[in-house]
């Protein structure tokens, strides 16, 4: 009886989580106009938890969305030692998903250029992007969908701030480096821990991300641990920080190339973004956009990222 009750509760929570993630993805798509009628969306699938979840949620939205669009999954086999070549074709065939496996030995290039024991992720990522842009052109894809989530975006923001001296994050939508494609990140509003729980419940055949033997990006790992500590000690802080990325006030920063500080003159008209001297901003005690539905998130018994630093994303 107890086992049956626990099972029902787990199913109930899993269903709530599934609905929430679909809602968040749908909202992100609408907010940034990520997918339009007639689009051919190339979903980059690495075999990590995030890209699996992305594909699964997009397939559900495709079945219920009021507009027609195509999906095609693409995996880049980089010839890393031990890569299970049969896993993704088997999974995609089983769910009747159109796909293409691209074989390109970028692994050898990376090993030749990067010294043993160093982090290879940056070069590997650049090579991978170049191949994927080419494949997108060959497939006639109008959008390239990547599986980066909210935590990836915040991590990138802090990496650029702490180590690069830039206020720069990872946009939910952008034009690709070659200027020919639109890249979208439909998971932009989704928490990593929710995606991990979603993948665990769905039992996706996760492929490890560390087959290349690369050392972890220590800077990113420091940022990730910092954010995890904040999330535990100050619930809602990450939500507030993400909201801040959507609420920029250039007049209260210090970039003269973005705001005309030099030409500022008094005009006698009060403006909302103007300097309020010592008047304190009315700040809410409750973090902005705090998701009160967290009870629907359940943690897997042995949470396995499957995508590690890169979020399991191509």
UniProtKB/Swiss-Prot annotation:
Protein name: tRNA-cytidine(32) 2-sulfurtransferase
Motif (PP-loop motif): 46-51
Record key words, sorted: 4Fe-4S, ATP-binding, Cytoplasm, Iron, Iron-sulfur, Magnesium, Metal-binding, Nucleotide-binding, RNA-binding, Transferase, tRNA processing, tRNA-binding
Pathway(s): tRNA modification
Subcellular location: Cytoplasm
Oligomeric and partner information: Homodimer.
High-level lineage: Bacteria, Pseudomonadati, Pseudomonadota, Betaproteobacteria, Nitrosomonadales
Gene designation: ttcA
UniProt GO BP: tRNA thio-modification
Source organism per UniProt: Nitrosomonas europaea (strain ATCC 19718 / CIP 103999 / KCTC 2705 / NBRC 14298)
UniProt record similarity statement: Belongs to the TtcA family.
Reaction equations catalysed: cytidine(32) in tRNA + S-sulfanyl-L-cysteinyl-[cysteine desulfurase] + AH2 + ATP = 2-thiocytidine(32) in tRNA + L-cysteinyl-[cysteine desulfurase] + A + AMP + diphosphate + H(+)
